[in-house]
Amino acid sequence: MKGRSFRMMLLALATVFMVAGCGGDNSDKVSNPDGAVAFAIHEQSDGILGKLLNDVKAKSEGAGWQFVNEIAGGNANLQLDQVNKMVDDKAAAIVVIAQNGDSIVPAVKRANEAGIPVIATNRDINGGVFTNVINNERQAGELQADYMAAHLPQNAKVVYIKGDMTISAAVNRYEGFKEAIKAKRPDVEIIASNSTGDWSEAQGIRELSLWLGMYPQIDGVAAANDNMAIGAIKAMKAAGRFNDSVIVCGVDSIDDALASIAAGELKMTVKQDADKIVETIMGLLQQIKQGQSPEKGDVLVPMIAITKDNLSQYK
């Protein structure tokens, strides 16, 4: 009797493992390569994110692939529903610019279970399995440090204006700058940085207005984006503390930043290479359309330093 009970227990355990094996993660499979390329973007954008959507759409349709996209309008719950529908519609692949890195996770996991590859870009997703095509944000800070290291005077004093430090891009830009400037120019001192920022020009004005009252010497300003860098320049001008020897560096290569470089005020910015991001995403989609599951994890896209010396290539 004991032997029969033991055999029944083994059979029950085997059944449990077989059932478990029937579901679960199919993220290494491509269940429907003939389906549509689906693109979920967090909000309408005329900048780099809008370019990503428009270029992937144009190239996908140019390749003869069906293409669908959804715009969440800043609503994380709506985006969750949109991506879930893409899973239900059996898309070939889903490209996501997430409104919220936590809220979107259940839909990413559903896509994994359905064998639909997920490609994330620009914004973090905090769970599930996906390929993450992102700028090398750490390199952005390193490029700023490279420029400052080459142009700052001995024993220079600099300040750093952080972006939203809940976002990994802001953290990596700051860490890249801090470590690179220390390694390249140990004589340079970062005398101040804010705890977090909102990426706005007003933030740059506020921080520099405060620091100008505290520090008689500020030789350089590195900012996590161009808007804050331009705000810093405005604050320094208003205080009568801006001149050609002050080095201000930004990130994003927005039109106002390029104009400021042309005017000799902003010394450099860092360009997110949208064309390279699109090229990388299209390469992954080509794999998927051929039935091949792409490599998971981060795919880092290099950034580009823009100064007066190469400005004409990017205006």
Q: Model-derived features: where do they sit?
A:
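Sec-dependent N-terminal signal peptides
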Residues: 6-14
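A residue-level marker of the well-folded mature domains of exported/periplasmic proteins
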Residues: 2-5, 22-315
